[in-house]
Amino acid sequence: MSKNEIKLQMEYASSYETWLEAAEKLDVIEGKYQWREQKESDEYDYVLVESRLHELRRHRLSKNTRLLLGLLRNSVARDFANMDNSRLYNYAHSGTKKLIDEFIQEVLMCLTYLEETPDLSLDEKITEFSRLKLTTGNTALILSGGGTFGMTHIGVLQSLHEQGLVPKIICGSSAGAIVACAAAVRNKEEQEILLRQFHTGDLSVFTDPNAAPPSVIQSVKQYFTRGCVLDISHLERVMKLLIGDFTFQEAYDRSGYILNVTVSCGSLFEMPSLLNYITAPNVLVWSAVVATCSVPFLFKRATLWERDPLTREVSAFCVTDAPLWMDGSVDNDIPHAKLTELFHVNHFIVSQVNFHIVPFIMDPTSHNWVERCCKKAIDLAAQEVSLTFRLFAELGIFSVLFTKLQSVITQKYSGDITIIPRLNYREVNKVIKNPTPSFLLDAATRGKRGTWTKVPVTRNHCAIEILIAAAYTRLIKRSKSLK
């Protein structure tokens, strides 16, 4: 089979297993599989990894629990021996160095041994796994905005769900919040059903599905009479049906997922808000999604609604004198700092489908010098435009508009792992149209295929964290059952 035929197999694979099999074949043909089998590389400390691997294995097999525990405390961090170096995952298609994969598997076996060993008391295990949780930190999955292209996130979530790699912290902005919230208010079993049947649901968020789309003249008239092009009531109706009547606190209690939604304020001096069960426990999730999807000029700014946990009375959520909110992507598409502050997040998986952003995202660690030069040029151009917008804002020329535009340009739109599904730019005209079932199926497929290329790095970066968190939860439950 030729290289081009294998690439086509990868491009049109129907499952991750099929894609991985083709990726390994391509690595063999290109000589990259041999690179994976060779432990040597300047990109990480392979000597330290190999020696630590042998030490961990020796202590686990000989059941030297105390010595093993001491070693693990210094071995579970993602950046141990520089193993999180993105260059290690940019060369071969099917994964990184086999030594790194072997090390991760050994750490997982050691953690399982610690959870099950009779050498430690239950309280000791809880204490040690709590410390290990702090050492590894937390991963957050962030789903960007992108209009109907945001439905590509369905496939991203499907792939991560199938591999058992969905983080407990999920954040969404604008269209990404629709998928994030629909998933995070449900438990794992319900999530699986939702993701499988998402394309059959009602997502008529822009216009009445039973009426003809408004003409250009009607849209212009609507804008000048109401200040927006589309009626927000359709978005509200669909979100209530899709998400239900849960508050952020209720969603967390129900599913265990820490759901976050970013919203922007329309004024000049208000900071963007990150809504979750800590900052806005009683806010209704559907209203947060409506607010973050309220694209300026397209929809009117929205009101956040909260429900009193005692009286069940619903009222406007107002933490400022300006209770109207809009598209979270304007100020904070990827809220790195706030998530780090609130939830000890030190690792970000970003699914980026903003069609106006994706062409400009380039890997700074790329081996391709042309890509590196292009990225430098784009960064310099963005800085110049940003300074111009800032100057206009400081001179009082449309201050709010130019401040928001500057925010859009200067934001960071990528993460430690950035998933960029292939977008169909021929369908840009559908970005603010009600998505059809066929469009949703195609978007989900693109999302899945875009995620498969990142499964090896995601698994190696997150497997230890996920096992530690699961073991800690089991130990806590066991402790409570004994009381």
Curated annotation (Swiss-Prot):
Entry superkingdom: Eukaryota
Motif residue range(s): GXGXXG: 145-150
Example GO BP: triglyceride mobilization
EC number(s) from the headed UniProt entry: 3.1.1.3
Function comment: Lipid particle-localized triacylglycerol (TAG) lipase. The lipid droplet/particle is a lipid storage compartment which serves as a depot of energy and building blocks for membrane lipid biosynthesis. Involved in the mobilization of the non-polar storage lipids triacylglycerols (TAGs) from lipid particles by hydrolysis of TAGs, releasing and supplying specific fatty acids to the appropriate metabolic pathways.
Active site positions, chain numbering: 174, 327
Any single GO CC term annotated in Swiss-Prot or TrEMBL for this entry: lipid droplet
SUPFAM superfamilies assigned to the protein according to its UniProt record, in alphabetical order: FabD/lysophospholipase-like
Alphabetical UniProt keywords: Cytoplasm, Hydrolase, Lipid degradation, Lipid droplet, Lipid metabolism
Top-level taxonomy: Eukaryota, Fungi, Dikarya, Ascomycota, Taphrinomycotina
InterPro entries: Acyl_Trfase/lysoPLipase, NTE, PNPLA_dom, Triacylglycerol_lipase_N
One Pfam family this sequence matches: DUF3336
Name of this chain's protein: Triacylglycerol lipase ptl3
GO MF term list: triacylglycerol lipase activity
EC main group: hydrolase
Location of the motif GXSXG: 172-176
Catalyzed reaction equations: a triacylglycerol + H2O = a diacylglycerol + a fatty acid + H(+)
Residue span(s) of domain PNPLA: 141-340
Compartments reported by the entry: Cytoplasm; Lipid droplet
Keyword Zinc-finger: no
Main location: cytoplasm
